[in-house]
């Protein structure tokens, strides 16, 4: 595929270029990605199906069987491996490097993201615990403590969003540019992304709106089936007999698998948007460096 990456574009230009790249090469993209998406989607669908169908996973007073825990853990590892393969395959389409090189970078990226997610979760949990314990020791009402804790959590979430948004540039650069290093994700490339925070935000905002509109339509059948399953579980908790047919879970699994499979291509399109955003920012930064050294 011929791709003109390093060119100054507006956010609308990035979205348009991503759509053109995706639509004109859909057959090639499908041939190169379908297997990795299937490998990722199968365990994901099993986990969702199991989490919705197992009473042990939905009732706090029921012990979770060891076999269920082992199966869920195995599916999680399988899905994570499929996700890494999927990222590597998509990046190989864009950077034409070997699959091995892209697998290494995708694995490193996933490990970094897991650590960042864990760090953010720990910080939020610590702050929430500190706020609640402080208010309880001050004999403030539980309602006021909950409200304050919620407000602080929203503020912290917003702060993390602001701080991590430039990573949408530095991560793409790490995956695409063979000269980029791991340290650049929160180093030089991160600083470049920070200088273009507004551009990244508006690109993310508009892309997110389009993404959510399409995803809403895509997930409608899945949502209807899940709602039926949840209603049945609630009825069973109240002592009512199950009212779903015997083949319901086959339908649930098939719908989940198909939805997650198609959803992956929506993710590919959105990644193309930030691929072009990366190219635009990189072009601007190169021109900036030339003007400073001239």
Ranges and model annotations:
Residues 41-79, 121-160, 215-264:
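Membrane-helix interface segments in multi-pass membrane proteins
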Residues 1-56, 156-235:
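Nonpolar helix-loop interface/hinge motif
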Residues 83, 105, 109, 160-164:
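Short capping loops/turns at secondary-structure boundaries
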Residues 17, 96-116, 187-192, 201:
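Interfacial transmembrane-helix boundary/kink motif in multi-pass membrane proteins
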Residues 12, 79-89:
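Central hydrophobic cores of alpha-helical transmembrane segments in multi-pass inner-membrane proteins
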Residues 5, 60-66, 85-99, 163-180, ...:
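Juxtamembrane transition segments at transmembrane-helix termini in multipass membrane proteins
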Residues 15, 30-31, 73, 107-111, ...:
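Hydrophobic alpha-helical transmembrane segments
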Residues 70-74, 78, 108-129, 195-210, ...:
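Hydrophobic alpha-helical transmembrane segments of integral membrane proteins
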């Amino acid at each position: 595929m011929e791709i003109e990456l390093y060119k100054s574009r507006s956010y609308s230009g990035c979205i348009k270029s991503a759509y053109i790249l995706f639509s004109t090469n859909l057959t090639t993209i499908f041939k190169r990605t379908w297997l990795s998406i299937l490998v990722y989607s199968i365990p994901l669908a099993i986990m969702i199906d199991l989490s919705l169908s197992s009473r042990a996973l939905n009732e706090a007073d029921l012990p979770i069987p060891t076999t269920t825990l082992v199966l869920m853990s195995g599916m999680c590892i399988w899905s994570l491996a499929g996700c890494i393969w999927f990222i590597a395959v998509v990046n190989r389409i864009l950077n034409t490097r070997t699959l091995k090189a892209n697998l290494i970078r995708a694995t490193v990226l996933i490990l970094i993201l897991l650590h960042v997610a864990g760090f953010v979760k720990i910080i939020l949990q610590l702050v929430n615990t500190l706020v609640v314990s402080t208010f309880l020791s001050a004999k403030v009402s539980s309602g006021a403590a909950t409200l304050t804790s919620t407000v602080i959590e929203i503020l912290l979430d917003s702060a993390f969003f602001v701080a991590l948004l430039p990573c949408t540039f530095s991560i793409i650069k790490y995956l695409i540019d063979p000269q980029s290093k791991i340290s650049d994700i929160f180093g030089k490339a991160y600083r470049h992304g920070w200088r273009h925070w507004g551009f990244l935000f508006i690109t993310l905002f508009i892309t997110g709106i389009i993404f959510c509109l399409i995803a809403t339509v895509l997930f409608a059948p899945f949502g209807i089936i899940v709602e039926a399953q949840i209603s049945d579980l609630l009825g069973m908790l109240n002592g009512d007999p199950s009212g779903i047919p015997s083949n319901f879970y086959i339908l649930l699994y098939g719908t989940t698998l198909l939805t997650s499979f198609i959803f992956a291509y929506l993710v590919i399109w959105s990644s193309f948007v930030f691929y072009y955003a990366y190219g635009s920012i990189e072009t601007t930064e190169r021109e900036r460096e030339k003007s400073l050294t001239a």
